[in-house]
Every structure is written in C-alpha cells, then in structure tokens.
C-alpha cells in the first residue's frame, strides 16, 4: 500500500540505520559496562513510547519499573566502574550515541507494530533491510572497501556470516514475527 511507504522508510531508518550506526560508534567510544547498562534502558523507552503512540496504559507497577530501572542504570553509569579506561576515547559521546541507539530501536519496535498487522514478516523484513542498506551505504562504504576480503581467513568470514544472519537478521525477523501477536512492551 502506497500510504505505508513512509512508515517502511521510517522504521528502516530507525531500526536499521540510526540504531546500528549509533550502536557501533557508541561501542567504539564508550566502555563495555556503560554500553551494557545503557542498552538495558530500551524496555523502559519502549514502554514510554508505547504509552504515547499505541495508547498502552501505564499502571503503578509499570511506572515503578521505569523509575527503578532508570535509577539503577544511572547509578551504574555514574558510580560503576571507577577504574581508568584506556580504550574508550570519548565516553560521554559514546554514552549519548548508545542512548540514541536505545531510543531508535525502541521507536522502531513501536512503529513497526502497525506494519505487522497488515503485512507478512518476510515482506516487512525484505523492504526494511533493502531500504536500510541504501540508507547506511554512504556512511559505511569507506569502511567496507578497506576490508581485504580476499585475505580474510574462512573462520573470520564464517563468524561474520553468523553475526549477520543469526544475531542480526534472525533477531529482527523474530521480533517482527512476535509483534504480530504481542505488544512491543512484551518483546
């Protein structure tokens, strides 16, 4: 349906482009502890966005969970690992990018819900990955061509394939499939 084009482009932008680019750059700039803690904010973000855009009710247990989860994440980030970090060149920027990643992925899960009510999972994934690939291409092309694919050992190629297929494609596929019957806050 032509009226769904903008939603497909929007969820591809949120779920494939912004989400992935901010996540990987945030990992590069921040610490592993901070990245793990900030990514745990995603369910809180989904709950808030679902209440705003999908009219899901916020009750006392949900609001309490938001407050406790957010407080715990902030405490861990501020008071967590106090040791000197060598390989995190810009922790504040990395943390902001990781928060942007969590927000964009949460928004993706909320906004893709409408598409799951209308289209098959494979159809959504096909268009989302295609559109997302075109969106990320200008940013990732220079890194991609620097890789010496011919000299890469098979075990490295196999591991890259595993990450792309199992941890990326299957995760997105199963999330979209689950959204056909469940609200985003459950996923």
Q: Where do the language-model regions lie?
A:
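Transmembrane alpha-helical segments that form core, pore/gating elements
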Residues: 46-47, 84-144, 174
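Structural signature of hydrophobic alpha-helical transmembrane segments
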Residues: 25-42, 91-103, 155-165
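Specific transmembrane alpha-helical segments of multi-pass solute transporters/efflux pumps
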Residues: 1-39, 75, 164-182
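Hydrophobic/aromatic residues within transmembrane alpha-helices
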Residues: 26, 52-54, 58, 115, ...
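Hydrophobic transmembrane alpha-helices of multi-pass small-molecule transport proteins
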Residues: 9, 58-81, 136
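Specific alpha-helical transmembrane segments that line the substrate/conduction pathway
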Residues: 23-63, 184-187
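Membrane-interface helix termini and inter-helical loops of multi-pass transporters
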Residues: 28, 77-91, 141-160
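Hydrophobic transmembrane alpha-helices of multi-pass small-molecule transporters
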Residues: 43-51, 66, 73-76, 109, ...
């Amino acid at each position: 349906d032509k009226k769904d084009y903008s939603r497909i482009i929007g969820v591809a932008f949120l779920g494939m482009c912004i989400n992935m680019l901010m996540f990987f750059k945030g990992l590069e700039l921040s610490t592993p502890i901070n990245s793990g803690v900030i990514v745990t904010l995603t369910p809180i973000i989904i709950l808030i966005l679902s209440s705003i855009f999908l009219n899901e009710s916020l009750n006392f247990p949900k609001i309490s969970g938001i407050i406790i989860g957010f407080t715990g994440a902030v405490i861990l980030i501020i008071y967590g690992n106090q040791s000197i970090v060598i390989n995190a060149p810009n922790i504040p920027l990395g943390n902001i990018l990781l928060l942007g990643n969590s927000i964009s992925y949460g928004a993706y899960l909320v906004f893709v819900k409408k598409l799951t009510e209308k289209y098959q999972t494979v159809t959504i994934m096909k268009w989302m990955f295609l559109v997302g690939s075109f969106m990320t291409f200008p940013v990732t092309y220079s890194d991609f061509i620097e890789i010496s694919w011919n000299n890469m050992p098979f075990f490295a190629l196999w591991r890259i394939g595993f990450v792309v297929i199992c941890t990326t494609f299957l995760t997105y596929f199963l999330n979209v499939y689950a959204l056909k019957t469940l609200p985003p806050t459950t996923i």
